[in-house]
Amino acid sequence: MLIMVISTYGQGIDMQAHMESDEAKEAYSDYLQKQASYYTGNCIYDSLLLIEDATLFGRLNALMGATCRIEQQGFSYNSLRDAYVNVDRDLNTQGRIIGYYDGCSLSGVWDNARTWNREHTWPQSKGADKSIAMGHDMQSVRPTSKAVNSDRGNTAYGESSNYYDPNEVAINNSYYRASNNGSYRGDAARVILYDYLVYGAYGGHQNSLYNGNAQLLNKLGTSGVFESLMVLLKWHMQDPPSLTEMVRNDGAQNYQGNRNPFIDYPEVAMLLFKNQQSVTTYTVQYNAPAMIHPRYMQTTPAGFVCYVTDANGSHPANLSVSGAGYLYDATLGRLTITNVSGAVTITVSDVAQDIETTTTSTQNCKYMKNGQLIIMHNGTEFDVLGRPVK
């Protein structure tokens, strides 16, 4: 039995746009194509996973600067109003949009903010004024029910008191969950990550869109935009990207040219902040020989993301994990590991049998073979000292 743990294109499914519908399937297919065509050259997936920290920030920050056309097109805060119907579209009902935080289906026609208005995920008062690109960026300014938007104000996101938690949407002091039974914690985290990546600076890297108020690590706590980096990464990991986010990412790219990499590749967040968080080494065990990218072996305490595929390229239907919390999407084979409490053991059953040797061109995969740690590079096996394995 051979279980490969690899990264593939694809993220998640949410409750308001089921993959079973023809519209959702078509939208997901379009997403995969647009995602694959956007990351080219030194920004292809395999290349991004080989770098981290400031180097990774610089590469993606440059990509954002090169592809974002907000300023070139002369877009403004008012430009967003009529564009939402093509960006935040409700896959179930034409002409309607999905509201931020509550997941409600709203009319896509602008009614002078009587029903919905525009929510600055990164508040205007904390650096994203509507007069500058960051303040009218389609990726981060979202259509939101008027009452819900008023409830949040400019409060920083977080779980403790004095913070705003999108899992506890309140109107007139009455709390309720999002209408699609989903969560907007991860959505909010990924927008904040995006704003930092596009408009911030790190390690000497910044593009022409730089905004000195977009320095995430200086914007933590009640006076900032997030309670802590640890809570942000936790939300990002525990609430993976949904189909609605994917559809929105495509629409935002159509509108202004650039994408949100944290929706396309959630893994890059862990690599980007590796040196800002304590690093934990996880012992990951499988019930069969396996390959796993070494970056997943050392990551932040928030966890890691991997993709499970059997020898025939199918995703196992049955998977369990001990030693950690986990979320598994069998449709995509995506496994999100959270709340690690010890050695992580992943058990997979009912997969294709294969006793033949499988080679791969994937860079720097790590796995165990006959009790020895092996690193695969360009189809050649090396030991931990870099010597070819005979």
Locate each region found by the language model.
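Hydrophobic h-region of N-terminal signal peptides that target proteins for export
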Residues: 2-10
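Short, glycine-anchored, charge-dense loop/turn motifs used at functional sites
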Residues: 382-387
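Secondary-structure capping and domain/repeat boundary segments
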Residues: 278-352
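Domain-level detector of nuclease and nuclease-like folds
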Residues: 110-117, 122-278
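Residue-level detector of functionally pivotal "anchor" positions at catalytic/ligand-binding pockets or at interdomain
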Residues: 277-283, 349-377
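Short, His- and charge-rich active-site/binding loops that engage polyanionic ligands
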Residues: 97-108, 112-115
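N-terminal module-boundary/linker segments of secreted carbohydrate-active enzymes
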Residues: 11-103, 271-272
